[in-house]
Amino acid sequence: MEPAPGLVEQPKCLEAGSPEPEPAPWQALPVLSEKQSGDVELVLAYAAPVLDKRQTSRLLKEVSALHPLPAQPHLKRVRPSRDAGSPHALEMLLCLAGPASGPRSLAELLPRPAVDPRGLGQPFLVPVPARPPLTRGQFEEARAHWPTSFHEDKQVTSALAGRLFSTQERAAMQSHMERAVWAARRAAARGLRAVGAVVVDPASDRVLATGHDCSCADNPLLHAVMVCVDLVARGQGRGTYDFRPFPACSFAPAAAPQAVRAGAVRKLDADEDGLPYLCTGYDLYVTREPCAMCAMALVHARILRVFYGAPSPDGALGTRFRIHARPDLNHRFQVFRGVLEEQCRWLDPDT
C-alpha cells in the first residue's frame, strides 16, 4: 500500500533511537570533467636563451607584441635555465611552433624591426602546456615542462584530497547510502536487480524518495534512478507509475528546495508552468553508477549532486561519457563516487 503523505518507509537500521553510524573507511571522490582529470596536453614552442639579462625587459616587450599568446595566457614568457651549468641564467618563450616545426633562426622567428634580437641566443624547441591546468596535479605536471600560472579551485583540491566533507556530513552521506543499500536488498529479495537509490533535500537532510530497480520485460526503463525521479514527482503531486506493489519504494511530499524558497531559481531552471524542475537543489544517492538513460534523466530533472557507490561497466558518469560535466548540455551537476563502495559492490556482481 502506498505510504501516507510524508511517511517514507524507514529501514530498521535507521529508525529513531538507533546509534548514529560511525563513518566507515570510504572516500567520496569527485568525478571531474575530462579536461580536469586528463593528462596535460603539450604543444611545441620556440624558446631562446637570454644571453644578456640587461636586455630581458626590452626583449619581453617586443617579443610579446610580435607573438602574443592569447590562447595560452597561463604560460610565463621567461624561465630560469634548467641546466645548472649553463652560461645563461634565463630562457625566453618566443612563439608556438605550429605543425611545421623544425630548426629556425632568430631572423626567421623575430624579424627586424619588430624585434631587435640582441641578447638572445639560438632558438630551440620545447614542449609547453597547451591549456591552463585545472587541478593541482595538472599544475605539477605542467610546470615540469614550462612555468605556468595556476588559479586553484580550493573546493576541487579539497575534494581530491578527501577533505571536502566534514565528519557530520560524512555520517549523513553514509546514512543515506545505507538506505539505498537497504532498498537494493529489498529489490534482490523480490528477484529484481539489486540497485537502490535515495533522493534527499540537502538543505534539510530530508529524504524525499527511496526506490530500487523495478525493471522487467513489460517496463525495462524502471531503473532505480528513474523510479526515484518518478517518486519525487509523485511527492509533488505528479508522477506516472504506480509503485504500490513495491513497498520499499516510497516518497514524501516535497517542500520547495532552499534555492526556490530563497528566490534563487532562474527562469531557465523552471518548467513551463513556472515550477522548478523535479530535482532542483536535491542530492541523489545510488548504489550503482547510473547508465546513460538515467544520467540524462538527472540532467533534465536538474539534480544538484549525485553520490554513487560502485562503478558500472555501462556507467555514464565516471566510467564513460561524463554526462554530468559536458559543456554542450544546459545543466551540469557534481558527482562523487565511492560512498560505501565495498558494500555497494557486493550487491551487484556486474559492478
UniProtKB/Swiss-Prot annotation:
UniProt xrefs under InterPro entries: CMP_dCMP_dom, Cytidine_deaminase-like
Pfam families: dCMP_cyt_deam_1 (PF00383)
CC per GO annotation: cytoplasm; nucleoplasm; nucleus
Amino acids binding Zn(2+): H223, C291, C294
A single BP term in Gene Ontology: tRNA processing
Annotated keywords: Acetylation, Disease variant, Intellectual disability, Metal-binding, tRNA processing, Zinc
Cofactor: Zn(2+)
UniProt-listed CDD domains: nucleoside_deaminase
One GO MF term attached to the UniProt entry: metal ion binding
Chain intervals for the UniProt region annotation (Disordered): 1-26
Modified residues (N-acetylmethionine): M1
Segments forming domain CMP/dCMP-type deaminase: 171-336
Disorder: Neurodevelopmental disorder with brain abnormalities, poor growth, and dysmorphic facies: An autosomal recessive disorder characterized by global developmental delay, impaired intellectual development, and speech delay apparent from infancy or early childhood. Most patients have dysmorphic facial features, and white matter abnormalities on brain imaging. More variable features may include teeth anomalies, distal joint contractures, spasticity, peripheral neuropathy, and behavioral problems.
Family: Belongs to the cytidine and deoxycytidylate deaminase family. ADAT3 subfamily.
Official protein name in the record: Probable inactive tRNA-specific adenosine deaminase-like protein 3
Lineage: Eukaryota, Metazoa, Chordata, Craniata, Vertebrata
